[in-house]
Amino acid sequence: MLASLASAQQVTKTVHKKAVKTDMVTTGTLTIRKPDYVCIATDGDKDLLIMDGTKFTMTMGGKQHVTDSRKNPQFATFHSVLKAVINHQPIPAGEELTTTRSGGLTTITIIPAGKKRQLFTSFVLTVDAKTLAFRTLRMNGRNEDYTEYTFK
């Protein structure tokens, strides 16, 4: 499916915690609408990651975090990348951003400059180089912890 259509894709979410022996795996859906709406719902809609314009809402384990990309530089870059992919536009250049291509995939890595008090140390989005369909989104935390979404 093209990422630019109002569409739903299946998603598998893997939460890896270094201190826990077994990864937590749940499934759900990814919904995308132009120009800049993304909703990843997993675990029976208990866990949500929503980008609605510049507003990001993340609900995990009953805790909700809300931020606005206009006030949070880490999410400003993430927002501009997602919006570009959804709308089939060039990925914006930036100091915190690297883009690589390999095997028909484009990998976009965002490493925030100011790592103090950030929820994540980096974001890694992999998309199909031709269709720009989302393939994976990995949000790396501290201590080798991460949350990874795999899209089908």
Describe the residue ranges of each PLM region.
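N-terminal leader/targeting segments and the immediate start of mature chains
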Residues: 1-29, 33-37, 45
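A short, compositionally biased
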Residues: 6-8, 50-54, 131-134
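Flexible, processing/modification-adjacent segments and terminal tails
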Residues: 9-17, 23-24, 59-119
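Short hydrophobic/aromatic-rich beta-strand segments that constitute the beta-sheet cores
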Residues: 13, 38-42, 56-59, 108-110, ...
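Extracytoplasmic
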Residues: 25-27, 35, 44, 53, ...
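Short linear motifs in intrinsically disordered
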Residues: 29-31, 39, 45-50, 98, ...
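An acidic-aromatic
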Residues: 30-80, 147
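Gly/Pro-enriched, hydrophobic low-complexity segments
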Residues: 99-152
